[in-house]
Amino acid sequence: MTHALCACCVALLAAPSACGCDGIPGSDAGRDSGSVVPMGAPSAQALLDEVAGCAGVEIKGGFGLDGAGSVSMFACGSAVYWNADMDVDCDGIPTPPCDTDPAGQPQTSIVDLAPMGDVDPTLLPYFVIPLGTPESPWYATHGIELGQVGAVIYDGQVHYGIFADEAGGWFIGEASYAMCQLFLGPPTGGSDPCSPIDGGIDPSAITYVTFTGAPNRATGNEIYDHARHVEIGVDAANAWLAER
């Protein structure tokens, strides 16, 4: 699907930040922005402690992992959380190495909301929520929409991203190539830990926390702006921790 660039960014393509269009699809804008979390951001342990101490209400169960096991999603105040693995999602603009993904799709679910065209999975950290069967946006009744900001927690690290893609069926635990790279780093010695074919992170090692409600959602040109996602996510995470 082809979308026209916003008029501002056509004129300022060489300096997209001048019109609030950081992270233009196909550019290198924002590639490393998620690796720097601002001062005052909650730690990974603080978020995990909140998950552990919350009497979460199950909102959807029966999701599967690549390996054995069943996963449920829980609501806790202004957040929804789940534990899963991280398979690498390469849907969206097919730039290398995502153009080699045999399961890759030419667009993400957020494409129709993205004013400058689809997102690039090698540039934008995002995560995926499955639709179940029959497929439906069941998550909307729990304050989640495409563009919602969330925290992804693994190995003492927290990185923020948006909900940008849906998965058909019941398998859970996917995030973009860019999100995987924030945790595992770039290819080294000819080996890519985030290869869309056999990379990613082992089952159940990841905690995903999605912050609900309109204030915690990226819309319009914000969809491409990972620095903005971090800002929204840090504020939402601190507010969530203050609820109890």
Role assignments for model-derived ranges:
Residues 190:
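Acidic/histidine-rich helix-loop elements
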Residues 1-39:
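Ser/Thr-rich, Pro/Gly/Ala-heavy low-complexity intrinsically disordered linkers and tails
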Residues 36-161, 167-170, 183-187, 195, ...:
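Cell wall/extracellular polymer interaction/catalysis modules
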Residues 169-179:
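Short, solvent-exposed secondary-structure boundary/capping segments
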